[in-house]
Amino acid sequence: MIRYLTSGESHGPSLVAIVEGVPAGLALHPDDLNIHLQRRQQGYGRGNRMKIESDKAEILSGVRFGYTIGSPISFAIKNKDWANWTNKMNQFENPSEPVATIDIPRPGHADFSGRIKYGFNDIRPVIERSSARETAARVGACSISRKFLHDLGIEIGSYVSAIGQAFETEPNHHAVKILEKGAETLMHEADESPVRMLNKDLEKQAMELIDTAKKAGDTLGGIVEVFVTGLPIGLGSYVQYDRRLGADLGAAILSIQAVKGFEIGHAFKNAVSFGSEVHDEFYLDKNGNPQRKTNRAGGLEGGMTNGETLHLRVAMKPIATLMSPLSSFDFKTMSPAASHIERSDTCAVPACGVIAESVIAPVLANAILEKFGGDTINETKLRLDNYTQKGK
């Protein structure tokens, strides 16, 4: 089973991750992580922090001569901005100059609950770990599982279907057509857009909305469509609640900072439709093989993959740090106050797509390993190939 831990503060020296359970023999290079770290930093509406950092993973263990060796893989990503925060974020030495505490929580952030939960007299420690900067370490860690899946012929991609009121009003047939070539083809086309949209008119609207929000000191959220192609039938299980693949995918997606909603396929539209309008009918092709007319279920039925493209929809709320602050209060004086302002993005929905692609990779890799096993990637691949050949 693949599992990972991340460590590090937003303005500390480094972000660190340890990934355990990766089969031996997987070809792995730092660029397999760095390409997605760079993608995470892109997107119209990002803040000044992304102009400072150029995230690159330094792999420290678990790889020899370019191949995984079955032991835990560790890596570090240096925070360049640490040089500007050594006084405020020093691990051991008392600050050389007084450091002001942060006492006013931001509505919508972890500030309020985190300060009370951990008994801090300063919100700064909460901000440092709850920050979405942590997702750089997660994208790096999950990129290893992503490479494992890629080498098994399984591809992950995404695009943005909504930013604020700039949203798709009908199914994107262009996306469906691209997916015939694999989810990574979709990913590359989306990456050509500053907001990772496939519709140029919508892209223009979204960028104008981001400009408007930035001028107003406001923020924007949106919706990301995530797809996975090449999955075999039968990953997950209906036998027990905790083996249903959709539950694990939901947990991974909802662990992303600012993500508040998740659906598989057209779940919410399906919920208000007749069953005859929802379920994906079968037909037999000219070779007598069963096919589907539609994919409204999003590639999952009964907690298992059904051979269709996996389709997840991810709802990201607007970022909680507003340059035109909302109403709050001061913990020290217990009097009304404008909420704290922290350097932030106006819109991070494009980055959310990259993060969502990443966090589902270990879930899918573990589903593969649960079904097919293998201490080496060659063992896993052989068993997967035998299984898929039998299904043809």
From Swiss-Prot:
Q: Name one GO cellular component term.
A: cytosol
**Residue sites binding NADP(+) per the record:** R40, R46
Its biological function?
This reaction introduces a second double bond into the aromatic ring system.
Name the record gives this protein: Chorismate synthase
The set of disulfide-linked cysteines is: none
Under the heading NCBIfam families, the entry gives: aroC, PRK05382.1
Q: What InterPro entries does the record point to?
A: Chorismate_synth (IPR000453), Chorismate_synth_AroC_sf (IPR035904), Chorismate_synthase_CS (IPR020541)
UniProt keywords (A-Z) are:
Amino-acid biosynthesis, Aromatic amino acid biosynthesis, FAD, Flavoprotein, FMN, Lyase, NADP
Q: Which family does it belong to?
A: Belongs to the chorismate synthase family.
Under which EC number(s) is this enzyme classified? 4.2.3.5
Question: Which species is listed as the source?
Answer: Chloroherpeton thalassium (strain ATCC 35110 / GB-78)
Query: What cofactors are annotated for this protein?
Result: FMNH2
Instruction: For this entry, list what GO says about its biological process.
Output: amino acid biosynthetic process; aromatic amino acid family biosynthetic process; chorismate biosynthetic process
Q: Which PROSITE patterns match?
A: CHORISMATE_SYNTHASE_1
| Pfam families found in the cross-reference section | Chorismate_synt
Residues that, per the record, bind FMN: R129, S130, S131, Q257, A258, G302, K317, P318, I319, A320, T321, R343
Q: What binding details are noted for the cofactor?
A: Reduced FMN (FMNH(2)).
Pathway given for this chain reads:
Metabolic intermediate biosynthesis; chorismate biosynthesis; chorismate from D-erythrose 4-phosphate and phosphoenolpyruvate: step 7/7
Give the reaction(s) catalysed: 5-O-(1-carboxyvinyl)-3-phosphoshikimate = chorismate + phosphate
Kindly state the subunit structure of this protein: Homotetramer.
Query: Which PANTHER family has this protein been placed in?
Result: CHORISMATE SYNTHASE
Give an example GO molecular function. FMN binding
Leading EC class: lyase
